[in-house]
Amino acid sequence: MTKFIFVTGGVVSSLGKGITAASLGRLLKDRGLKVTIQKFDPYLNVDPGTMSPYQHGEVFVTDDGAETDLDLGHYERFIDINLNKYSNVTAGKVYSHVLKKERRGDYLGGTVQVIPHITNEIKERLLLAGESTNADVVITEIGGTTGDIESLPFLEAIRQIRSDLGRENVMYVHCTLLPYIKAAGEMKTKPTQHSVKELRGLGIQPDLIVVRTEYEMTQDLKDKIALFCDIKKESVIECRDADSLYEIPLQLSKQNMDDIVIQRLQLNAKYETQLDEWKHLLNTVNNLDGKITIGLVGKYVSLQDAYLSVVESLKHAGYPFKKDVVVKWIDSSEVNDDNVEAYLSDVDGILVPGGFGFRASEGKIAAIRYARENNIPFFGICLGMQLATVEFARHVLGYEGAHSAELDPSTPYPIIDLLPEQKDIEDLGGTLRLGLYPCHIKEGTLAEKIYNKNDIEERHRHRYEFNNEFREQLESNGMVFSGTSPDGRLVEIIEIPKNDFFIACQFHPEFLSRPNRPQPIFKSFVEAALNYQQK
C-alpha cells in the first residue's frame, strides 16, 4: 500500500519545507523506494499559469502539460523524477471542481460545505498522486504556515486521511524555526512549541520535527523540543543553514531521517543509504575553479525566481567544466541599440529566456543583434527564439517593422503568428501548447551535434509559432531550421551556422535539467561561453 508523508511549516514562511520534502524524497529514492511528491497551494488561482511572474516566480511545466508551482522544479531536480498534473493542487482547482460538480447536480441538491465536500476533493487528489505513479511513498508539502486561514481545509483533509488509511500508513513532518536571540546569546524553542501546539489543536500530532537553525543545536535543546512537543528525541532533526542546497540531504541522512521514516511507515527499503553520487556532486559544487558570466536579458529580472529553472540549468551546465556560472541580470526594458554594448561587452555568453507581452521586447532584440553581429555565444528560449527570427528578418533580410503578431498585431511581416485553429480562442487560460512534445532534428546541424540523436522530447509553454510563410526567405539568407515537429510543420530549433554558437529553441529545455545530468543545449552553451572566454 502507498504510504503518505505530509510536510507542514510553522513559525514563519520560507523555511525550506520544499527543500526538506525534496531531500527526504531523494533519500528514500536512493534506498530503492518509488517516490512521488506533491504540493498543496492554498491560493484561489486555478493554477499559476496566468499569475504575474513578479507575484509567483516561474511557472514550472510538467510532462503532461500542467502549469505548476516552481517548487516542483526543486522536487524534480533533487529526486530526479518526472512529476504529473496531480503533483500540484491549488485551492482554486479544488473549489472550481467542487462547484462544477454542484452545477451538474452531482450532490443531488445537498448543501455543499468545506467539510466534507472540499476535504473529500483534496483527499481524492492526494490519492490520485499515488495511484497515477504507483508510488511506494507520496510526500505532500502543505503550502503556507500553520494557522493560516487559507490552509485549514488542507490541514483538515490530511488529519482525516490518517483515520481513512490507518496510522501506520501516514506520517507528519513539521518544519519550524529556532531563532537565535543575539542579546540573550541563545536559541529559543518557544516558537516551535507554540507552532506544534497550533498544529495539535487542529488534530495533527507531528511524528518528526525538522528545525531550521543558524547554529548547531545542543542535545539539551533537542531534548526540550522532544519533551514539550511529545515526540522521540531522535525525531528532532536539525537543518542548519547551508552554503549549498545540495548539503541538505546529507545533513538529514547523518541524523538518520530516512531510517526513522522507513521504520515508522514499515517501508521495505531495498538498499542501505547510498549517497556517493550526491557526495560527488557536492564535492564538485564546493570545488569550482573560475567562473563564466552569462548575460541573462529578460523583463522580470527584479524577481530572479521568475527564471529559477534557467539559472539552475546554467549552474548544472558549469559543473562538468568545474566552473561557476554567474548570471549578470540585465533588464531588457533598459537596453537599446545605443547602449547594448555597455551592458553586454563583459559577458561570455548571452541568453534571452521566455516571456510574454510587448514590453521590453525591443531590448531583447537589441541584445540578440549584438550577439549575432559580434559572434558571442547566444542561446534563446521560447520568446528568445521567436525574437531571434524577428531580429534576423529585420536586420539581415531588411524587413522593416517585422515582429511577432503577439507583440505587434499590425506588423507588415508577422514572422511569429498564431496557428489558424487558435485564432478564435479568447481566454488566456488553457490555450497554450503545453507539456512534452517530440522534435525531429535535421542531420548535420549544431542541434544534432548537441543532442547526438535526431529525435528528442522537450517541454513546451507557448501560444504563438514561427510563421512558415517566411521560412524559405530566412533559410536562403543563412538561418537553419534544425528542429521541427515530426510532421515538419512547427519550428522547434533555429541556428546560424555562420556564428560559432547561435542557437534558439521554441521549447523550454530548462525543465529537464538535473544537477548530475545537465541539459544538452545548456551544457553546450556554457562550453561555448568558456571557449569564447579563453579566446
Curated annotation (Swiss-Prot):
Record protein name field: CTP synthase
Gene transcribed to yield this protein: pyrG
EC number: 6.3.4.2
Domain of life assignment: Bacteria
Record's signal peptide: none
GO molecular function, one term: metal ion binding
Modes of activity regulation: Allosterically activated by GTP, when glutamine is the substrate; GTP has no effect on the reaction when ammonia is the substrate. The allosteric effector GTP functions by stabilizing the protein conformation that binds the tetrahedral intermediate(s) formed during glutamine hydrolysis. Inhibited by the product CTP, via allosteric rather than competitive inhibition.
UniProt: UTP binding residues: 13, 188-193, 224
Binding site for ATP: 14-19, 71, 240-242
